[in-house]
Curated annotation (Swiss-Prot):
It comes from Mycobacterium ulcerans (strain Agy99). Its EC number is 3.5.4.30. HAMAP family: dCTP_deaminase. Keywords: Hydrolase, Nucleotide metabolism, Nucleotide-binding. This is dCTP deaminase, dUMP-forming. DCTP binds at residues 101-106, 119, 127-129, 148, 162, 174. Pathway: Pyrimidine metabolism; dUMP biosynthesis; dUMP from dCTP: step 1/1. Pfam families: DCD. The keyword Hydrolase applies.
Length: 190
């Protein structure tokens, strides 16, 4: 069940759904707008010959923060990691779905490539996978609305929410754009 604006406010007021900082004006009919933080991770295209999800590649990305008051410029065909300004905390019976903003999609900005699902129990900033599919650079302003988070009520609380021992919650408590940790639980078929 997708939560309405009324249900979202009730979950936030009850302290079950955490959004910090929270701005009530960002609550939409069935989602909460999320804003862009000021930190990004750009890919170092000369450090490795290829990307291998089975290997730890610490120098694959570098942290970048634009000068205060300046935007980050995302060039055509470029892919970078960003994050939400807000920290989210979901209880064991709520999950999230991150979606892009229609107005930004119409400019050629993709907010996430594949990882739009937020597990019940997650706590932290949401990492954004930002791509420019337009033919011109796009300026990304820290604090701008970058997407919307829909909250879904599970039919029953998760038995092992994200962050529980044994679940392999690699990104619990993440701060800012967090690079891939796929190597930590990579499985190859034999």
């Amino acid at each position: 069940m997708l939560l309405s604006d009324r249900d979202l406010r009730a979950e936030i007021s009850a302290g079950r759904l955490g959004i910090d900082p929270f701005d009530d004006s960002l609550v939409q009919p069935s989602s909460v707008d999320v804003r862009l933080d000021c930190m990004f991770r750009v890919f170092n295209n000369t450090r490795y010959t290829h990307i291998d999800p089975a290997q730890r590649q610490d120098e694959l990305t570098s942290a970048v923060e634009p000068t205060k008051g300046d935007p980050f410029v995302l060039h055509p065909g470029e892919f970078v990691l960003g994050s939400t300004l807000e920290i989210f905390s979901l209880p064991g019976d709520l999950a999230g779905r991150l979606e892009g903003k229609s107005s930004l999609g119409r400019l050629g900005l993709l907010t996430h490539s594949t990882a739009g699902f937020i597990d019940p129990g997650f706590s932290g900033h949401i990492t954004l996978e930002l791509s420019n599919v337009a033919n011109l650079p796009i300026t990304l302003w820290p604090g701008m609305k970058i997407g919307q988070l829909c909250i879904l009520k599970l039919t029953s609380p998760s038995e092992h929410p994200y962050g529980s021992s044994g679940v392999g919650s690699k990104y619990q408590g993440q701060r800012g754009p967090t690079p891939s940790r796929s190597y930590q639980n990579f499985i190859r078929s034999t």
